Amino acid sequence: MGVAPRTPGGGGKFKKFKKTFENLAEAENVLLWTNANHTSEWGRGTVDTGTQLYAAYCIAVKGYTSLSPQYVMKNIVVRGARCCVTANDRSINRMVTFDGANITIGTPFSGDTSHWESTIPYQIFGIKGTELN
């Protein structure tokens, strides 16, 4: 006997829930931080994103120190959820945690960790429409 997957709020509300998350990828972003040293290896770090908190953030990650900033992978992370970011090469993942306005991007915990220092957080954006009071 199979079990049907449960969706938040049932059928009709699920469509709205799904649309909200689809819209996050296309929403307007507010630049909160740029890594001034994005051409150097990056271990673990905490970034103060200012006084305006967001429920959702977009974190852009470079795959290598030598990559031009236009070649980044954008990751959406949500406050209160277990999140990680990646640059889509070598399957290197970094855990993201929140503490007030501080966002900590940790050292990689999976993938080809022999080259982890090359997966570099580049920019953090707040996603408009998810502002917290």
Where are these regions (language model features)?
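Generic cytosolic/nucleocytoplasmic N-terminal low-complexity/intrinsically disordered segments
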Residues: 12-18, 61, 73-74, 81, ...
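Enriched but not universal
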Residues: 1-26, 32, 125-133
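Intrinsic-disorder/low-complexity loop/linker signature
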Residues: 10, 18, 23-24, 51, ...
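Intrinsically disordered, low-complexity segments enriched in proline/serine/threonine
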Residues: 7-10, 71, 110, 123
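Compositionally biased, intrinsically disordered/low-complexity regions enriched for serine, proline
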Residues: 2-5, 66, 105, 118
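Hydrophobic beta-strand residues in large extracellular and virion-surface proteins
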Residues: 17, 32, 47, 57-59, ...
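Beta-rich globular "head" domains
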Residues: 23-83
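Extracellular jelly-roll beta-sandwich "head" domains, especially the C-terminal globular C1q domain
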Residues: 86-133
